[in-house]
Amino acid sequence: MSYNCCCGNFSSHSCEGYLCYSGYSRGGSSYPSNLVYSTEPLISQHLPAGFLSLQGLSGDLLGNP
């Protein structure tokens, strides 16, 4: 899985969890939205600006404005 190398770089559980869920979302919203809510505040503190774009994708999936 491609997210393993990313998570290895940051050694962050929030990074691993978020990227795993975001990967599933590409195949369809097959996961509860609360999983994104629980990880979203964490990744904003651990990931660089380049990865914050993933947060925007999660917002769209959740129907946030």
UniProtKB/Swiss-Prot annotation:
Keywords: Keratin, Repeat
Domain of life of the organism encoding this protein: Eukaryota
Pfam families with a match to the protein in the record: PMG
A GO cellular component annotation in the UniProt record: cytosol
Disulfide-linked positions: none
Keyword Repeat appears in the UniProt entry: yes
Keyword Repeat: yes
Assembly behavior: Interacts with hair keratins.
Physiological role: In the hair cortex, hair keratin intermediate filaments are embedded in an interfilamentous matrix, consisting of hair keratin-associated proteins (KRTAP), which are essential for the formation of a rigid and resistant hair shaft through their extensive disulfide bond cross-linking with abundant cysteine residues of hair keratins. The matrix proteins include the high-sulfur and high-glycine-tyrosine keratins.
Protein's name in the database: Keratin-associated protein 23-1
Gene for this chain: KRTAP23-1
